Amino acid sequence: MALKVVSFPGDLAAVSFLDSNRGGAFNQLKVDLPFQTRDRRAVSLRRTCCSMQQAPPPAWPGRAVVEPGRRSWDGPKPISIVGSTGSIGTQTLDIVAENPDKFRVVALAAGSNVTLLADQVKTFKPKLVAVRNESLVDELKEALADCDWKPEIIPGEQGVIEVARHPDAVTVVTGIVGCAGLKPTVAAIEAGKDIALANKETLIAGGPFVLPLAQKHKVKILPADSEHSAIFQCIQGLPEGALRRIILTASGGAFRDWPVDKLKEVKVADALKHPNWNMGKKITVDSATLFNKGLEVIEAHYLFGAEYDDIEIVIHPQSIIHSMIETQDSSVLAQLGWPDMRIPILYTMSWPDRIYCSEVTWPRLDLCKLGSLTFKAPDNVKYPSMDLAYAAGRAGGTMTGVLSAANEKAVELFIDEKIGYLDIFKVVELTCDAHRNELVTRPSLEEIIHYDLWAREYAASLQPSTGLSPVPV
């Protein structure tokens, strides 16, 4: 059910997290949640402060150029996979299975699916295996009892970190969801491994810490999600300063054709009906709210160094154009393909090379059969997440991680039917508001993890019975 907000604390009404210039859509959304007014003077001061912050070095500053002398890998490239039993991990292993002459697995880490992990060990014969849930180590050993191949097994978080920095690995595929993937990614960077990045939190929460670290260790961060891979492919070989604008495409999610006034009636089952992609519950809800796209705006800023004013979102219902860039001469470059995550994952593993894919398992795009491609501007009233994401991005520092963690908790509460669909936006805004006075512009890894946990706890404390006011625990 939707949560009725009776009133807010007076100081919260005076100083809101959202920028009034971009957050006005909230005031037009007629639902059970009254949204407060914005203090323009506070916004102006925030922008002045934010503009003085030194941004971390982007992974790819508007262009991607292969360094002179770089050669293709001779023989199967050794890789580690963190999160091997999840969606990214299993698709990565599908790629390895199809290309044994190009890739080999040296280490695997999983959370708790030891049955699938054991099957993966038997098939790919890694040297090292980790299971994050330490209580399942004996079960994994039992599942491998009749296996001729006996890898080293290290349990717990330390095991996942050891997989990430395995000495034989050249590239590490990071497929763990949430801040749990941050420490292994940092360990891989410190060990000099290139990162096939499928964990959004690495940059959204950890960007201010991770990017300088990657620069220090001369590590490549290669985006494995479809939108950022599309941008990465489009900027290959661009001259310095040629990038003018980034255009992220979005399907629009389950409610792209719903009228705004019907959103207060949304049920969990409605939000889990994605029109194009088959994904997990959390990311499917994020597609419905467009929070996934808001988070991708932040990730694009960190990856490519574009200002937030130069990153746009366009609704593209067919999900064939995965994203676009505009160059200084007004040319627009796009990357097209069927909605298939294997393509961007493969490119992170093979870059800068292109690997042949059989059309038997990788259907080729037929534009004539496809027909028309359509586009429309996103509705800020229907998708308040965009205003929240842009505001968090401009605030920078720990605010982007707080936004991501609060959204993750809010979606969990929604899926568990503890809050309504529209309450997701309010929980995120209130959590970001509460973090304003504690924002750290250049956080350490410990501070990033601390505020991730804090945001989840604060979001969970916003109870219906108190009108979304925090409940002390």
Curated annotation (Swiss-Prot):
Binding residues for Mn(2+), per the UniProt record?
A: D225, E227, E296
Q: Which GO terms describe its biological process?
A: isopentenyl diphosphate biosynthetic process, methylerythritol 4-phosphate pathway involved in terpenoid biosynthetic process
| Function, in words | Enzyme of the plastid non-mevalonate pathway for isoprenoid biosynthesis that catalyzes the NADPH-dependent rearrangement and reduction of 1-deoxy-D-xylulose-5-phosphate (DXP) to 2-C-methyl-D-erythritol 4-phosphate (MEP). Required for chloroplast development.
Q: Which SUPFAM superfamilies match?
A: 1-deoxy-D-xylulose-5-phosphate reductoisomerase, C-terminal domain, Glyceraldehyde-3-phosphate dehydrogenase-like, C-terminal domain, NAD(P)-binding Rossmann-fold domains
Annotated organelle transit peptide span = 1-49
What HAMAP family does the record point to? Answer: DXP_reductoisom (MF_00183)
What name appears for this protein in its UniProt entry?
1-deoxy-D-xylulose 5-phosphate reductoisomerase, chloroplastic
Q: Give the gene name.
A: DXR
Q: Which cofactor does it need?
A: Mn(2+); Mg(2+)
Cite a single GO MF annotation. Answer: 1-deoxy-D-xylulose-5-phosphate reductoisomerase activity
Q: Which family does it belong to?
A: Belongs to the DXR family.
Please name the InterPro entries in this protein's record: DXP_reductoisomerase (IPR003821), DXP_reductoisomerase_C (IPR013644), DXP_reductoisomerase_N (IPR013512), DXPR_C (IPR026877), DXPR_C_sf (IPR036169), NAD(P)-bd_dom_sf (IPR036291)
Query: Does the record bear Ribonucleoprotein in its keywords?
Result: no
Name the Enzyme Commission number(s) assigned to this protein: 1.1.1.267
Its UniProt entry gives the catalysed reaction(s) as: 2-C-methyl-D-erythritol 4-phosphate + NADP(+) = 1-deoxy-D-xylulose 5-phosphate + NADPH + H(+)
- The residues that hold 1-deoxy-D-xylulose 5-phosphate are K200, S226, E227, S251, H274, S287, N292, K293, E296
Expression induction or repression: By the mycorrhizal fungus G.intraradices colonization in roots.
